[in-house]
Each structure stands twice: as C-alpha cells, then as structure tokens.
Amino acid sequence: MVQCRPPQEFSFGPRALKDALISCDLALKQLYTSAFSPSERLFLSEAYNPHRTLFSTLLIHSAFDWLLSRPEAPEDFETFHASLQLRKQSLARKHIYLQPIDLSEGLAGCPLLDHLRSCAEAFFLGLRVKCLPSVASASINCCSRPARDTDGLQLHTDGILSFLKNNKPGDALCVLGLTLADLYPHDAWTFTFGRFLPGHEVGVCSFARFSGEFLQAGSSIPDSALLEAAAGGPETLPQEGGQTLCYSALGMVQCCKVTCHELCHLLGLGSCRWLRCLLQGVLSLDEALRRPLDLCPICLRKLHHLLGFRLLERYKRLHTWTRVMLEMWSGQEAGEPSVSEDTLPFSADSGMGCESDTEPVTSPSEPVTPDAWSHTFPDGPEPVSEEGLSSLAASEVLLKLGGPVDALEEYRQWLDACIQALEREVAEEELVQVDAAVDALGRWEMFTGQLPVTKQYMPCVKDNVGLRRVLGDKFSSLRRRLSSRRLAKASSSQCHWGAEN
C-alpha cells in the first residue's frame, strides 16, 4: 500500500467550512443564531477558525483512504436540512432499539449491551435506548457462508434487515441489530461492518472484526459497584475449555464507534468530509481506529437540529460515561503500550478494505464497496446499502494494540476542554472578530464538476519565413518519396497479377 509520510492535510478552506456550518441561506442563518448561545456559536466556529484547537483537519494517510477512493459532494447543513423534507421519519418517537443477535443474557452479552446503551444515551441526548431480547441467528431467515479470511460462518445482511423491518416496534425511531458474527452483504464482498435498509430505519452492524488482538485474556470480573455505575463490565466471551476472553477498552470503544456511527445514519446524517469526525467513512481497520469518537461541529449541528439538546449538557454526559469507563479499565491494562494518532497499529488490510459511504439521494447512508482485492463492482447501485463501516478486503489484523486506557483518557481530556469552552462567557464582539477574519479570506478553488476549457494557443507574432520554407521543402520531399513508392508498388502488383493470369 502506498503510504503518505507524513500524512497530508485535506481541507475545503475556512470559507467553505463556514458556509457548510451556518449556510448561505438567510433563514438558516437566523435559525443558527436563535438556536445557539454566543458561547455555543464560538465553540462551533472551531469548524472554520484557522486557529482551531478542539477539532482537527482531515488527514490522508495513504492513496487508498476512503476520502480519495470515494469522492462525493460533502453534505453541508443546508443539504441535510433539505433532505429532512423527504424523510417520513417522525422524531416524536423517542426510542432507539438495539436488537442483539446471538448475544446471550449472561456475561457474554449483557455487559457489552449495557456499555453500548449507556454510550448511545449520552451521545444521542434526549433519546432513550432500549435493548430488545436477544434472538438466535438460526431463527432468522438469512443465508450464511464460510468466511473467506477467517474461521467460522458469515451471515448475509439482507435476511437480518428483513427480520428487523418486519419486527420493528411501533414506537421505534430506529432499530439497530448488533452481532458478534461476521457479516457479508454480497457474494463478491469479503465482509462488512454494517448495512442498513433505506426508508425503514433499520440496520445491522458487526463487532466480529474487533476481536483477536482487541480481546484480552481474563478470568476475573470487574468490581460489581463499577459494573452497576457504568451499566456493565467488560464484554466477556466464553471460550472452549472454560477460558474467558474480555474486550479491551480499545475494543469496546471501537464497538461504541460503530454503533453510534450507524445510528447517526439511521437518524438521517450523511457521511462527513469536512473535518475529522465519527461520520467519516473507512476503507480499512486502520482508518476505523483513527476515527474519533465524536462529531465535528458541522455534524453536531445536524444532530442538534434533530434532538434539540444543549451542547454543554451533552458533553457532560459523555464525560461522565468516559470517566466511569476509565475507572473500570484503569489498572487492568496499565502495562500495555499506548496508541496514538501517530502510532496506530498497522493491519494487513490497510487501505484495501471498504467502508461504505456513497449515499443514495433518499438516504444519508453509504453503500458498501466490493472486494478491494479483486476490484470488482456489482452492476448498479445497491438498493439496501447502509452506512458504512464496510471493510471488504480485510485480512487478519497483524497489529499489537495497546494503550486503550490512554485513548479513553485522551478523549476525557478533550471533553474537559469542550466543557471549559462552553462554560466560558462570550461576547458577541468576539464572534464578530472571528467571522470577519474568515470572511476576509479568499475562497479556495475547488473542482466544480466541469472539465477545464481547452487552452487556446495564440499565433506567434514573429513568423520565421526561412524556417517555414525549409520545413515546407522537407515535407514536400517526403510526400514525393511516398507517392513514388506507392506507384512502384502498384505497378509491381499489376505485373504479378498479369503473370498469374
């Protein structure tokens, strides 16, 4: 794989980022001013402030990154707002349902579900997240096949999506199936992290690829008080011979990322191409690990428009969830090396997998990409393409994952900085200064979808008569030689023809 060393920045420029957040439409500008306080607007202005400190510019790490492999028009707030008029989804329904598949009610399932539920309720503040009773995959009419790159069977997503659609609760805003089984959406694809059914607000995601190095051996159960405070302990998977495997904190965070990513798409948010964001697509496990656990300001405004929470309250809830998670895992993984943006583990499928992120017009979610090893694509768009973390050419993860507690601690410190920024008193003059500085900048040139105009060559002012005469004589001589050869060849052919007759 071609790596960019160091990673290259990708940005649309401050002016475009400001328009994506606030919009050029007068009504949407007024909506922005009325919906947020001055401190919230200054916080959100980090999206387009060239001196931002809380949010980061997108980085391209390889030539196979999702951003380069899936070029599409980014979804700004104005586009998102217009798409809501086409959706039949009713936000009067305040329940998100998680449907476990082959997750038992014992230690193998409940702690994981409790972690995901508590994270989702903090992330989607104002919505209630409920867990449905677990169902067996054998009771679902879905196809299966042997996995191509791992041991075990893979489940076809279409059968699961049909089951979720037919069994969707009446008060459900959306339903997301969760499974530890590997999934595949199409025979030509190796696997997918997630998929959804447009127009029905049902989806399914798999945590199968967050196993192996994401698991740590363990025989003890965390303190019961912490389990109660955090709504569950580390996920445990019973193994043959009585051995127990537990998700590391990093593995649990990845499961939370996938779940919240999928739920955002089910609520109507499209993929993000503006800043580093949870709603970025991924084409490899490396990209999934680098993706942050929260939204950029542009996507945060979209979610705020749907749910109407206060930004400060949401970040405080996420901070509480992160603190409890840290208390549960601190000490268990203290001896592991740390993982940072620059020292991420390298996987064999890096840059060769595929998350889906080509959104249909009627849905903000992305279709999954075919097997990147063969680079074969199915004919026509997939009618049920869901968002995506689809990684199609993934093989075994050949990395040593470490420092998951450090990753959670870094997220907690970032939440601290967000809370401090939102608690600060801000005057309108400070906002005016930031906006004026950005408005004074020129717009960056971007591809408009039109090919460049053919360059017109101006005639030379000075015409060299001597050179033109020499070239003319040369070409005339060449023409005479070619003509004489053609005549000689034609006469020779006639002689041969007469001799044969």
UniProtKB/Swiss-Prot annotation:
GO MF: metal ion binding; metallopeptidase activity
Electron transport as UniProt keyword: no
Top EC category: hydrolase
Active site: 262
Chain positions recorded as Zn(2+) 2 binding sites: 272, 277, 296, 299
Record InterPro entries: Archaemetzincin (IPR052009), MetalloPept_cat_dom_sf (IPR024079), Pept_M54_archaemetzincn (IPR012962)
Keyword set, alphabetical order: Hydrolase, Metal-binding, Metalloprotease, Protease, Zinc
EC number(s) on file: 3.4.-.-
GO biological process: proteolysis
PANTHER family from the UniProt entry: ARCHAEMETZINCIN-1, ARCHAEMETZINCIN-2-RELATED
Recorded family membership: Belongs to the peptidase M54 family.
Free-text function comment from the UniProt entry: Probable zinc metalloprotease.
The protein's name in its UniProt record: Archaemetzincin-1
Source organism of this protein record: Rattus norvegicus (Rat)
